[in-house]
UniProtKB/Swiss-Prot annotation:
Similarity comment text for this entry: Belongs to the PyrI family.
Record-given protein name: Aspartate carbamoyltransferase regulatory chain
Function description: Involved in allosteric regulation of aspartate carbamoyltransferase.
InterPro entries hit by this protein: Asp_carbamoyltransf_reg_N (IPR020545), Asp_carbamoylTrfase_reg (IPR002801), Asp_carbamoyltrfase_reg_C (IPR020542), Asp_carbatrfase_reg_C_sf (IPR036792), Asp_carbatrfase_reg_N_sf (IPR036793)
Lineage summary: Bacteria, Pseudomonadati, Pseudomonadota, Gammaproteobacteria, Enterobacterales
Swiss-Prot/TrEMBL cofactor(s): Zn(2+)
Annotated source species: Buchnera aphidicola subsp. Acyrthosiphon pisum (strain Tuc7)
Cofactor: record remark: Binds 1 zinc ion per subunit.
Subunit structure: Contains catalytic and regulatory chains.
List of residues binding Zn(2+): C108, C113, C138, C141
GO molecular function: metal ion binding
Length: 154
């Protein structure tokens, strides 16, 4: 008989980002500026997962992520789920899908890009090449980079 015990405290109301790949939880906290709130945030790192082997989880009380925020999670956590909780019950489960653009959360690898020298939010257009590799094109400097290159700059 398997005992199912919560390893991260339940929240009464808010958003739960589950199935985050291990070691990505802290990165999401800073990139999405989740810590710039007065809301209580609980994070579980390197937890056991049947689906991923290991996972991270983030719970944000009294905050419901927008569809735009959820979809931008997909660049880092394509198999994540976002659960909306009300009165300790799951009321909605959302699966992120890659948006056409990623705004504000990524840094352009081009050191000459205007976004690296002025207070301008970054913006990338997601593109797929002929080999189905995901590339990101900066809206400002118009340079195109492999997804892996952009994510390594963060």
């Amino acid at each position: 008989m398997e005992i199912n015990k919560l390893q991260v405290e339940a929240i009464k109301s808010g958003s739960v980002i589950d199935h985050i790949p291990e070691y990505i939880g802290f990165k999401l906290l800073s990139l999405f500026r989740f810590t710039e709130t007065e809301k209580r945030i609980t994070i579980g790192l390197n937890l056991p997962s049947k689906k991923l082997g290991r996972k991270d989880i983030i719970k944000i009380e009294n905050t419901f992520l927008s569809d735009e925020q959820i979809n931008q999670l997909a660049i880092y956590a394509p198999h994540a789920t976002v659960n909306y909780i009300n009165e300790y019950n799951l009321v909605r489960k959302v699966f992120p899908t890659l948006p056409k653009t990623i705004d504000r959360i990524l840094i352009c690898p081009n050191s000459n890009c205007v976004t690296n020298h002025h207070l301008i939010n970054s913006s990338f257009i997601l593109k797929e090449d002929q080999f189905f590799n995901m590339n990101l094109k900066c809206k400002y400097c118009e340079k195109e980079f492999y997804k892996k290159i952009v994510l390594s700059c963060q």
